[in-house]
């Protein structure tokens, strides 16, 4: 009974808590995205060794966002962050055609993990401001997202440095997670 009243109270007056894991290959723009969402500004970043964690409040949701480094030597550590993850943000450099296959393989590997079976997937197709950036349809194709069964996913075009598309992505994520 106490839990019911407490959850009703938080639904009416409080912010809903969500655990979000943000991963992707190195130099995709994860840390830039995190701090653009958190601070509303561009920060100078260096490659993330380990992780950054920040709370991002947006609308009625309090996202705890874990930004984990993407260098190939660090990727095996991603699995340590999977537990209790409700939303997975996979950031891809839309301009990096040479590594899109590598990104697709890493994403598919993660989506096989049991701990992420219920997580919704938001792909940020980042760096859309660059002239050679892949369109959303091409990105969806290269990441083989259309083969995903029993998984809610969405691809959002973004430009982290300008902030374009970031809040639209959070809107989609919050709408999907609120349904659960």
UniProtKB/Swiss-Prot annotation:
One of its GO terms (molecular function) is GTP binding. GTP binds at residues 24-31, 67-71, 126-129. It is found in: Golgi apparatus. One of its GO terms (biological process) is intracellular protein transport. InterPro entries: Arf1-5-like, P-loop_NTPase, Small_GTP-bd, Small_GTPase_ARF, Small_GTPase_ARF/SAR. Signal peptide: none annotated. This is ADP-ribosylation factor 4. One of its GO terms (cellular component) is Golgi apparatus. The keyword GTP-binding applies. GTP-binding protein involved in protein trafficking; may modulate vesicle budding and uncoating within the Golgi apparatus. May be involved in ciliogenesis. It comes from the Eukaryota. Belongs to the small GTPase superfamily. Arf family. Keywords: ER-Golgi transport, Golgi apparatus, GTP-binding, Lipoprotein, Myristate, Nucleotide-binding, Protein transport, Transport. A lipid is attached at residue 2 (N-myristoyl glycine).
């Amino acid at each position: 009974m106490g839990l019911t009243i407490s959850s009703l109270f938080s639904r009416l007056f409080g912010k809903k808590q969500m655990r979000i894991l943000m991963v992707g290959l190195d130099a995709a723009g994860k840390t830039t995205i995190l701090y653009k969402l958190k601070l509303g500004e561009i920060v100078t970043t260096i490659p993330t060794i380990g992780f950054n964690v920040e709370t991002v409040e947006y609308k009625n949701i309090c996202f705890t966002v874990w930004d984990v480094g993407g260098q190939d030597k660090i990727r095996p550590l991603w699995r340590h962050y999977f537990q209790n993850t409700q939303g997975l943000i996979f950031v891809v450099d839309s301009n990096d055609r040479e590594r899109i296959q590598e990104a697709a393989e890493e994403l598919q590997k993660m989506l096989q993990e049991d701990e992420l079976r219920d997580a919704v997937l938001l792909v940020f197709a980042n760096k859309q401001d660059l002239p050679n950036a892949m369109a959303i349809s091409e990105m969806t194709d290269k990441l083989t997202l259309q083969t995903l069964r029993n998984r809610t996913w969405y691809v959002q075009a973004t430009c982290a440095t300008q902030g374009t598309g970031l809040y639209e992505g959070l809107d989609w994520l919050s709408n999907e997670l609120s349904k659960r």
